[in-house]
């Protein structure tokens, strides 16, 4: 099973570009996967006034996880990936650099497809 944690920027990108994240990940993995979203990322959508994005992803039946409430969003994402051996799907360069240093497998967009950003 492939577990993927989705960052806020990926949710907004999919919504704005009318991309179906489940279809993209299905094409990429060619096997089963689970999508996790940290509650803090969902909360960020409200702050940046992207309620439509939040509702769109809630309709996917994703796993919303309340994890490490005391830390900032990036550290929470990284901690969850390390704790659960998940891949991180993000377009945030700074977050990708931190994840790479920690050995977290990173997914990113390659046009309208998904790619592994590190090995």
Predicted feature descriptions by range:
Residues 1-3, 32, 83-85:
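A general structural motif
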């Amino acid at each position: 099973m492939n577990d993927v944690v989705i960052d806020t920027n990926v949710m907004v990108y999919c919504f704005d570009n009318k991309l179906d994240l489940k279809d993209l990940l299905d094409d990429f993995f060619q096997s089963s996967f689970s999508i996790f979203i940290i509650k803090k990322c969902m909360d960020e959508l409200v702050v940046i006034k992207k309620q439509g994005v939040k509702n769109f992803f809630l309709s996917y039946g994703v796993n919303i996880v309340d994890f490490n409430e005391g830390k900032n969003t990036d550290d929470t994402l990284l901690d969850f990936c390390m704790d659960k051996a998940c891949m991180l799907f993000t377009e945030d360069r700074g977050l990708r650099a931190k994840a790479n240093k920690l050995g977290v497998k990173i997914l990113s967009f390659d046009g309208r497809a998904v790619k592994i950003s590190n090995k």
